[in-house]
């Protein structure tokens, strides 16, 4: 049976990092004028320079990511989204994850550390998945094929993912999530951890699935 996240206390909202770090990443990659133009195109200009401390309507976040893809193309959108994910993870590590967890998890066996991290992610899934549903499927057997550097240990799934709901993309559209998850796993579980989105609802998948390996 997969582990499933608890329901969001405020349905349909996402934490402000999804916008704050996107702004920061786009400023660095394309410049502040391009960032402002993106927010205008997405109809989200009020979010452009606001301090943003409250939860944000997930539809606003989705429109920003859609505008990023449409205005800049998938290659640049992927690069910016991954940078925003890295910045989000860095913020969480610095301000949201208790110091004792930051110190002790890397000292645990990777499997044990992963289970602690995943439990915390499921408990707080409402902050990043909004009205989507998050589940984890653990690998029943870990086998590393000849020539492979890592083995898939688990799969994180966001069903009805709000970030790309209704999108039609020739590729993966949730690199923001993939980068955030990867940074957290590398810092807290295994330095070699990799997180790849292997299925996306924007590309016709039944869910946004992230394979976690190390």
Please name every model-derived segment.
Residues 1-91:
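N-terminal leader/assembly segments
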Residues 53-176, 199:
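Amphipathic interaction/junction segments at domain boundaries or subunit interfaces
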Residues 132-136, 193-195, 213:
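Generic structural motif
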Residues 152, 191, 206:
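Residue-level signal for beta-strand positions within conserved beta-sheet cores that form or flank
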Residues 175-190:
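Active-site helix/loop of acyl-thioester processing domains in fatty-acid/polyketide metabolism
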Residues 195-214:
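Beta-rich nucleic-acid/ligand-interaction surfaces
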């Amino acid at each position: 049976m997969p582990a499933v996240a608890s329901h969001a206390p405020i349905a349909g909202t996402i934490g402000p990092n999804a916008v704050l770090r996107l702004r920061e990443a786009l400023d660095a990659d394309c410049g502040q004028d391009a960032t402002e133009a993106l927010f205008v195109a997405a109809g989200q200009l009020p979010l452009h320079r606001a301090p943003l401390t409250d939860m944000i309507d997930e539809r606003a976040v989705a429109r920003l990511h859609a505008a990023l893809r449409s205005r800049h193309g998938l290659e640049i959108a992927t690069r910016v989204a991954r940078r925003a994910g890295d910045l989000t993870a860095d913020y969480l590590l610095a301000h949201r994850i208790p110091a004792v967890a930051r110190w002790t998890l890397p000292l645990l066996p990777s499997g044990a550390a992963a289970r602690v991290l995943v439990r915390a992610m499921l408990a707080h899934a409402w902050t990043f998945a909004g009205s989507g549903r998050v589940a984890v499927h653990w690998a029943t057997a870990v086998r590393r094929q000849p020539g492979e550097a890592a083995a898939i240990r688990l799969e994180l799934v966001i069903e009805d993912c709000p970030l790309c709901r209704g999108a039609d993309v020739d590729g993966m559209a949730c690199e923001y999530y993939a980068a955030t998850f990867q940074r957290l796993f590398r810092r807290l579980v295994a330095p070699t951890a990799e997180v790849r989105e292997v299925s996306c609802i924007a590309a016709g998948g039944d869910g946004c699935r992230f394979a976690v390996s190390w």
